[in-house]
Amino acid sequence: MTSSGHPQMSSAGLPHEALATAGRGRTPAGHNGGMTDIAAVRSMLREFPLVDGHNDLPWRLHALSQADAESTDLTVADIGAGTLGTATQTHTDLPRLLDGGIGAQFWSVFVPAHLSGDDAVSMTLEQIDRVRALVEMFPDRLELADTAADVRRIHASGRIASLMGAEGGHSINNSLATLRILRELGVRYMTLTHNSNVDWADSATDDENIGGLSRFGTEVVAEMNRIGMLVDLSHVSAGTMRDALAASRAPVVFTHSGARSVTDHPRNVPDDVLDRLASNGGVCMATFVPSFVNQGAADHRFEREDAARAAGLEPTSDGWHPFLDRYMEEHPPPVATMDDVVAHIEHLREVAGIDHIGLGGDYDGTPTLPEGLEDVTGYPRLLAALADRGWSRDDLEKLAGANILRVLEAADTVADVLSDEPGRRWRIEQLDS
């Protein structure tokens, strides 16, 4: 309460405690008794942008078009006029983004880790072009953003702010010059690895090679700090996480990861790393991938991948994904739920702190999703579930977007401070034997 006796108000003009109290004693999901929370969440998201850290729609459109001789990447799915509640080829379209309250989206310009050298660079450029083309196709609903101020302005105009993130250091082909060019083209973060090691950093899902970052990898992080590109530590090994935290002068991000103490999967973040986010200022954005949020689903994933390897296949083999699909048909995996995601978010909050968490669903980057979060319309349900557990409006605003917007601003401040430093000219062979 304020000194005048009125309830303490948030910046959006609603009582901070409204969301935390409205849902207590709710009837089960699907009944009208739960709509008070949903309505309050939707009201909040109209005034405050929800920023999702990772969506793979650009690659999904590319993959769909490769299998359809009559369509292009921009025509293969009806992104602009998708119908809510019907089965579509993607988890994401513009009507569902609107229904999900997304105010800003980091579109992944992912390319597969089996691409290397110039092939990886050129495909990354095609992905950047695909995002730009999507935005140009729907100027009344999308606009490219680069800064936190851009996000707030675009959201206030009723459109979705569109940012880009590269997923894997293979996209720069060991070239600091290519890194700088990606930043010039609007890429705001780079995940240091994807599922495989790069020459200068270890991945969470590959055999240990370096033990973390090499000397050149440390220079990559330093150059990212200098140019204002966020260092994304999703997908990297625990050693790489720790080395990057030690090297980075700007806050780091995990754009789509969970808590390893909740689900023991190498893609998730150990508690000692989460504990260091407060001093670094960074953010861990909770993912929704079933095998990262549910232990039974994680164990099933290990089992089917072991079975594929026993059959003589590797992730780069043409038969890898068909084998996994057949295995899942014959041995259905456990079903993850929104409650699993809530458990991760609450653990991230407990260890890293309320100022160091966010959301990164990984929609269109995984074939299945938890019950209740099947597509991008699920965010209001998730936030309402947290409100039902006592989260205040301030808490939800931080999770939804305030924390990652603060990190963007901090990265830009660091880049301003470092702007007088010359760009690094090192070649990898000069630093790494």
Model-derived features: where do they sit?
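Substrate-binding cleft of carbohydrate-active enzyme catalytic domains
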Residues: 220-233, 239-240, 271-279, 347
